[in-house]
């Protein structure tokens, strides 16, 4: 293994007898993406390539004289003859086609963001990937990225917002917005909530499924890469829309208004040492709103966007607003044994969701390229859940309810540039998540007894929490022909604090906040990589190695108040190899790589979070360690026509010390306690199939399917 690693590490330094031709495809005002380029030698042998999503191309040829022809819709063909004797840089400059009718000049604009361009990106990519364009998404009812990701091969969406790729939970997947790694939006899991990004603000989504050295190392299932809108023309759009749901529209809806935590309420210690009389006075500071019932209206959404270009400067502003109602009927059961029920519940979950956001992109397209992109999003979810049924474990009839409110603010801002063979990115992320007054009201009576329902006061629950996270990142990359090197740094700082109460009577609260219900955390990650990429005829090779150094610190406490500092220090070497063979319309791929999964702040903090919907508490584990993952991919792709493809994939993954959520020892279904652990090993393998066919200009046929199997051994149990 060590010998193989050093071969991979120094492979980029090997030289070959052929020469490399690289360059860009541009017009006078903008980059031209995915342009076709044909090289014909003296023997009339043809070699083809295409520029990528950065308007760059590279090809390996034998020395000689070549006729070059490059074309793209909306531009005159670029034709030139050159003599190639050594490594050569060829910058292709297109001239726009114009058709003059009297005094009107019509310019044909080059298409971007199309399904054909995404298929071409996937085809030309060095790694195994799948994707969607905004052209395709517009033909669906999808209004946010969470909805759209359901249509990507091998991707499943949980709770309408969390992504599972190839059967791996959200904690094994990562997300990038433009070029910035997105943080977790959740206090109780490592996950990004994709429903907060509207599809109206994006150009495309690419999901990488195999790794290369220039990608982050902390993922295994999929790396979701979201590209926000860019503009090349002046435009103004205003849209209004409405949606009707047979289950949720014009139905009786229930919501309990949220309440802010009183600003003059005493600290945990001061409240606990107060007498009962003072506690009753303090309790009166809390609003105690009752549920309100109203008739839901149709979902409403609106959008405003405009773009402005002048010379080499482009600007884009876009904003959307959406108000929606969701109603879910849920059956929830758990068993004490294979045949004996622990409980049998019927839930009705009402969700009222409001979101608004804004996107501002400023771009300069000269000899060098610079852009500043900022996305601001605010979303609030108000939920009310009613639960009825039987709890056989506690011998009770249940008629309970809970209300929850979640406010999310996400700010993503980044500045990036490309200067000749250098490119860089500076980014900032801010996540704010507030949970004001999560309430649980357990109402029960004895099972099978004719008696009134009563509130179980000691099991009531009122919860307030605030989480904020700031992250800063920077990356720089440099190309030396077919060799690319780079490095980056990421800093994350998080704070979390919660206050928890229960009722002792109708007019007095008991604070049950623990020392574990707050933590601070910071995370430092430095990375360096070296990558080699080249083509020889029908073969393409991408190989390299990435090194990541990570410092990880979580400051919390145990139940006694004793400080608990969780410190981790990791140095990881992550090699990768991607090989493809392209024959006419068919492409074969092979990929092998090492990646990893680091514990999230929440997973190692001692904080215990009660989830009434799942009927469970979730507790962190301060002894949790990172997981090493070895990945293997084989893929066959066929491209019959532009924008069409058929593909079949085989994949396998071997996890060393996987991070798994388990039921804690001694836990029972009626009082479920979940935590995290590192089993010795796990494996995952499966197959994927995708079919994409364009029937007419307005009608596409698209289908995909995945079958997978996973095995994990926890304490001797598979």
PLM regions with names:
Residues 111, 120-164, 179-197, 201-213, ...:
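Periplasmic N-terminal accessory/gating domains of Gram-negative outer-membrane beta-barrel systems
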Residues 285-385, 408-409, 415-418, 577:
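Transmembrane beta-barrel wall of Gram-negative outer-membrane proteins
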Residues 459-461, 465, 481-584, 609-611, ...:
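Signature of Gram-negative outer-membrane beta-barrel scaffolds
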